[in-house]
Amino acid sequence: MNIKNEINSIIQNLNKKEFTKAITTCEKLIKKKIKHTVIFNLYGLAYQKQGMFLESIKAFEKSIELQNDNYLAINNLAVSFKSINENKLAEKFYQECLRLKPDHVIAIINYANLKEKINKFEDAIKLYFKALKFKKEVNEVYIFLKLSDLYLSIGNFEKAKDFAQRVVKINPDYVAGHVQLSKFINYKDDSKHLLQMEKLIQKKTPQNNEIMDLSFSLGAAYEAKKNYEKAFTFFNQGNNLRRKEIRYDLNDHIKLQTSIIKIFEDVKELNIIKEPFKSKIIFICGMPRSGTTLIEQIISSHKEVLATGENNFLSTYIKENYLDNFLLLQKKIMRDIYSKNYFFQDFVSRSLSEHNFESQVFTDKSVQNFLWIGFIKLFFPNSKIIVTDRNPRDICLSIFKINFKNGFMNFAYSQKDIAKFYKLYFDLINYWKKLYPKEIYTVKYENLIYDRVAETKKLINFCDLKWDPNCLRHDKNKSVIKTASVSQARKPIYKSSLNLSDNYSKYLKEMFSLLKN
């Protein structure tokens, strides 16, 4: 048997995405007692490419056991640990890989991605700059776009714009570069880039996803110029294209919400209280685009509070442990309510640690928080729950204008689905308020805009925090922001978004009429 030929055959399988074939070949060789570090590394890669990370970890560990300086396997092992949120182990192995091979560019970029994930943005930026030293081996456009995104998230708009401009200069037809650059241009006074995007969209074929991305950017540009008819035309085009590429059934959400209410109708009589969680979490709940990012920025401007953004720890645990086909598993939930175990709390605690969040008070504004308010009250009784409220028309318009990357937001690309989802949200929030009337604080976005000082003081008081004047300077907050609201949340509170939906009344009749009813 020629081992070299077998290895080449496995590599060909991987290149063709024939992962099952690659695994079968590796297993045949392993059964023949062939112990070869490369074979186990390829075995791990085949599993990794299929999302089977635990299996891949075993294979990579065996590869490293056979050759402890196999930096390729060590890098791959780090990737798998990162994929299952074992971020500290991932960091350990990236460091080991780069100790053995300091110029391993793929590991440098992977390590930068990990740093970004755990909110070490300054470290991520340094690593991307390190990767740029190897010009022949890196895709400069990819790294410049990453740097632009990172600088945007930490509020350095000047550098973010500079790197977006570099992307467009290198590749004038690269849509992602133009979409990024559009975030920094004031189209009221500048039409040059808008015309560039219009020329670019005409070059693209209708099947191309890039038309969708450009459509949302052009919609925002025309809105800035107060040309609402053209803005709507582009937003509508982007939504129609996005809707065609996703599968979404609102009935799945109805099924989940009905299941939630049924469970908590049974639970509410139990009067069971778990021990307080070791840290206080301030859960910010609300419809997307209702002001949750602004509220998090205000609260996390307090010297004692750390923002964790949309961390999704609650959703992850609930979906992995209590949910099956959009139905909650009542027996498992009841078992954990009655038991003395703290698996849920331990998972959240470890997740906070793995993502480098160290504080006694956190904010969590994950997009699905409003679904899990009952779980929050049961398992995190010392938490605070804030609900953001805003003109429903403005919320729904704002959703219509965004090309979200979050699968939970698949309702966002149809006027009818947006309005119906909002009504379901409204019903559930009212259910929670009746269930926990004294424990949910509602912040009205419009009140905050018109009476910032008084509303901010009431908000901080509800959180049982001492007054900190920094909370009135949220635009100076250096917390990382990873959501679509990043630009607005970095600015002082502004009134321009109030009742913006009035400008779209004749274009969004379907959505607004459903909201009325």
Name these PLM-found stretches:
Residues 274-380:
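Phosphate-binding active sites in nucleotide-utilizing proteins
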Residues 11, 38-49, 72-83, 106-116, ...:
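Conserved alpha-helical positions within TPR/SEL1-like repeat arrays
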Residues 376-399:
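Conserved phosphate-donor/acceptor-positioning beta-strand/loop module used by diverse small-molecule
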Residues 34, 68, 102, 136-138, ...:
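Short coil turns that delineate tetratricopeptide repeat
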Residues 163, 182, 194-206, 214-282, ...:
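PAPS-dependent sulfotransferases, especially Golgi type II membrane carbohydrate sulfotransferases
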Residues 15, 49, 83-84, 117-118, ...:
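Register position in tetratricopeptide repeats
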